[in-house]
């Protein structure tokens, strides 16, 4: 890990406390530069991102203490949206206020978003690439990566029979019912069953650091979230325009995804492929390429916006839909921060979230079958390659970056041999 430069904040040997971390304010530029480096180097998905954040902000810079960091992680796992990005926004907010929150998000998100927009424009300009063997290899990589996510999340979020059964029920819903209805239905099913039947042990509350958000601002954020959630579908219905429908679909995807990361896949597939915005082949190729990027997986929205067949595409479409998908998570974060200390003490809330998390595993399992498997596994060679890539991810613990590169090279090689 690189050592701090002379311009970095002095790192002392004493652990930070929540009060001290709140008092030590920094500049937006400081926040931007630290998160930009993380945005360029944080490979491995949301769980790995949280590890990078803890090393950087708790161990190295001491912007906050371990208890406060754990509380932020717990809150962002509880909320819909991209958990690692929400933790980053919360750290930026605590360090440099509202402008720091924006700086943290922009710096952490921009590197992978720009790279994916560039990849999309390359595919659009050189149309033959979409059907190339190397691009098909990226689709096969997506099978292995989503399977790994289902495997890991299942072990973590479905540790008992009741939650495993709930995940299976959610998977069946996603396969049998229309996509949008199935996903919402599975989340509601998980919330109801979790609140009614699950009994999770209570956890001690250890941190009481100020949130940096007033209750008035929290209520305003929640109201704005609800207005957009209800108003965007009406706008899309009244205008009958493709752009309004895209904004509504991507906002809804950001608002309904629990767990972040790969869980956004079925929601984005509904918002883009099912509406004819992009082809299934381009969708999976972009999803495979996104695995090789640092930073949040939600930047896949930038690829889809750039590839869009609607009124906006290229840089404008990519940047617009990138912003749209992150808005609900940011609003929910600022709405929840001032009330989290009260919410986390309620057993019903913990049980409900546990049920939703189990349903999320089922939603992702359904997406693994359709569209990921059905679009990528076209023969025995594809199945063998997917199995190899899965083993490298799970047992050899390869980085997704190397798995994606191997998949592209293998796909190209198989294209010559078959």
Segments (PLM) and residue ranges:
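Multi-pass membrane proteins that catalyze or facilitate reactions on polyprenyl-/lipid-phosphate substrates
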Residues: 1-79, 90-293, 297-418
């Amino acid at each position: 890990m690189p050592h701090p430069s002379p311009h970095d904040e002095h790192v002392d040997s004493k652990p930070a406390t929540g009060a001290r971390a709140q008092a030590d304010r920094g500049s937006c530029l400081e926040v931007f530069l630290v998160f930009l480096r993380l945005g360029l180097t944080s490979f491995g998905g949301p769980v790995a991102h949280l590890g990078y954040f803890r090393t950087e902000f708790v161990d190295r810079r001491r912007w906050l203490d371990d208890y406060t960091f754990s509380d932020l992680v717990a809150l962002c796992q509880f909320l819909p949206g991209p958990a690692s990005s929400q933790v980053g926004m919360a750290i930026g907010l605590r360090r440099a206020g509202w402008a720091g929150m924006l700086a943290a998000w922009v710096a952490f998100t921009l590197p992978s978003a720009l790279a994916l927009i560039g990849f999309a424009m390359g595919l659009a300009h050189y149309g033959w690439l979409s059907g190339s063997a190397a691009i098909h290899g990226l689709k096969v990589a997506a099978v292995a990566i989503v399977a790994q996510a289902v495997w890991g999340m299942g072990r973590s979020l479905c540790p008992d029979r009741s939650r495993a059964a709930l995940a299976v029920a959610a998977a069946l819903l996603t396969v049998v019912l229309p996509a949008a209805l199935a996903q919402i239905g599975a989340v509601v099913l998980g919330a109801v069953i979790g609140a009614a039947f699950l009994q999770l042990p209570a956890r001690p509350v250890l941190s009481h650091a100020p949130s940096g958000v007033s209750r008035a601002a929290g209520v305003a954020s929640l109201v704005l979230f609800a207005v957009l959630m209800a108003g965007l579908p009406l706008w899309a219905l009244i205008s009958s325009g493709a752009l309004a429908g895209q904004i509504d679909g991507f906002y809804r995807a950001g608002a309904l995804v629990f767990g972040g990361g790969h869980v956004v896949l079925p929601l984005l597939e509904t918002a883009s492929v099912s509406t004819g915005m992009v082809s299934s082949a381009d969708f999976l190729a972009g999803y495979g390429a996104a695995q090789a990027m640092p930073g949040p997986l939600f930047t896949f929205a930038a690829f889809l916006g750039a590839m869009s067949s609607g009124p906006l595409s290229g840089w404008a479409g990519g940047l617009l839909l990138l912003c749209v998908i992150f808005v609900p998570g940011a609003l929910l974060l600022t709405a929840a921060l001032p009330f989290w200390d009260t919410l986390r003490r309620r057993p019903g809330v913990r049980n409900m979230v546990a049920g939703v998390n189990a349903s999320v595993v089922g939603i992702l399992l359904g997406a693994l079958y359709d569209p990921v498997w059905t679009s990528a596994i076209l023969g025995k060679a594809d199945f063998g390659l997917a199995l190899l890539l899965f083993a490298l991810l799970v047992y050899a613990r390869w980085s997704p970056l190397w798995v994606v590169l191997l998949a592209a090279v293998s796909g190209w090689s198989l294209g010559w041999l078959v």
